Amino acid sequence: MNFNKLFALVLLIGLVLLTGQTEAGGLKKLGKKLEGVGKRVFKASEKALPVLTGYKAIGK
């Protein structure tokens, strides 16, 4: 019984590795979108942080 589970797991990992290489374009597009989101969040935080620190200074 354990051999069947191990064989199925190895087969599944092998299929994922083989099919993952053919879809590199899709993964690259996803990575670019995530990179763009990260840049937008970084720029927004650069704008918001001075405002927040000024607000905290007024509150003291």
From Swiss-Prot:
Q: What are the record's GO terms for cellular component?
A: extracellular space
In the record, which residues are listed under signal peptide? 1-24
Q: What induces it?
A: By bacterial infection.
**Main site of residence?**
secreted
Superkingdom per UniProt: Eukaryota
**Keyword Zinc-finger, does the record have it?**
no
Q: Which residues form a coiled coil?
A: none
- List of residues that carry Isoleucine amide: I58
Write out the annotated subcellular location.
Secreted
Keyword set, alphabetical order: Amidation, Antibiotic, Antimicrobial, Immunity, Innate immunity, Secreted, Signal
GO biological process entries? antibacterial humoral response; defense response to Gram-negative bacterium; defense response to Gram-positive bacterium; innate immune response
Q: Kindly name one Pfam family recorded for this protein.
A: Cecropin
Q: Which InterPro entries match?
A: Cecropin, Cecropin_insect
**Function, please?**
Cecropins have lytic and antibacterial activity against several Gram-positive and Gram-negative bacteria.
Q: Which family does it belong to?
A: Belongs to the cecropin family.
What is the protein name stated in its UniProt record?
Cecropin-B type 1
Q: Which organism is it from?
A: Aedes albopictus (Asian tiger mosquito)
Q: What is the lineage of its organism?
A: Eukaryota, Metazoa, Ecdysozoa, Arthropoda, Hexapoda
* Originating gene: CECB1
